[in-house]
């Protein structure tokens, strides 16, 4: 009797491959049986499932025409978008552009690539941002801000000496109440009702930080914006007051009861995402304390349009004012420094240098001039 041949040895890797193949066939059989039962068909016998010959895929054949619309037709990539200056108009950092869970055409477009794209309009009560924003270098704009400066102009209380170091603070803000329009993070469009108000306070650090003067402002702008253009029709009230401590120490100083109730028409246009031009004209229908009806204001701003992240970006702002009671004189203010813009809103924080020459923006001293330079910080929300 001839001995049985010894079977070839099977490695452990081969055994595992056989077991995986068997498991795959069993899973396929179960899946097909359930699918046939759900569809109301008779399942195939199990022996057919396991004994069916393996099918091979047809050979893959590719040609250049498969990647284009047809012979001779070439599809070009879209042209690159100009980004402008690196710091003022560069792309956002990946961690500061598109929040998680944000779908297409939402409040957070693709890293804010197109700030002016049309978006759906609807009603919004108390939206987070503004269609018409405050002028960065405007000395009578409602915001939170503070500046410390040295003024070489004569002191109104003692003309024989200079004003020296003074401290001006603005406590206020501008907010949107109601909007019919779009609601992106940056540069919304539509119709909007805003309110704005602030107290403009001047302290004298060299004299026990006495309150020299305070102006109070309240206004209601009606705003419309479409694309890169914004316009406003606004009313504001401004009144000037001499500080109580300054009044007690200088009882002979002639107090001015400067008051304006004014209608304003303003326009703003963004030539580039980071370059804004604006101008406005105001007519006061009620005047007191030397105020006269007409005033004009214009300026420009260069600032990063998109969220800056923690690194920030430089800014430059220039504003000029002209008023009828000053024989069409006024003042010019220049600010430059570093700015940070919020990720999920248009909130803007700035620090930098400020220079102002001309009529004192504290209207209690409207007929006195300033020539001042210093540092400041400003917050718009």
Q: Which sequence ranges carry the predicted segments?
A:
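Bacterial N-terminal signal peptides
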Residues: 27-40
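Boundary at the C-terminal end of the N-terminal hydrophobic targeting segment
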Residues: 43-46, 51
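Transmembrane beta-barrel domains of Gram-negative outer membranes and organellar outer membranes
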Residues: 50-54, 58-74, 78-93, 97-103, ...
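Short loop/turn motifs that connect adjacent beta-strands in outer-membrane beta-barrel proteins
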Residues: 132-137, 178-193, 271-275, 304-315, ...
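Transmembrane beta-barrel strands of outer-membrane/channel proteins
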Residues: 146-148, 195-199, 233-237, 279-283, ...
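Solvent-exposed loop/turn segments connecting transmembrane beta-strands
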Residues: 160-166, 206-210, 285-294, 308, ...
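Outer-membrane pore/translocation modules
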Residues: 184-302, 357-359, 366-369
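Outer-membrane beta-barrel "beta-signal"
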Residues: 334, 369-381
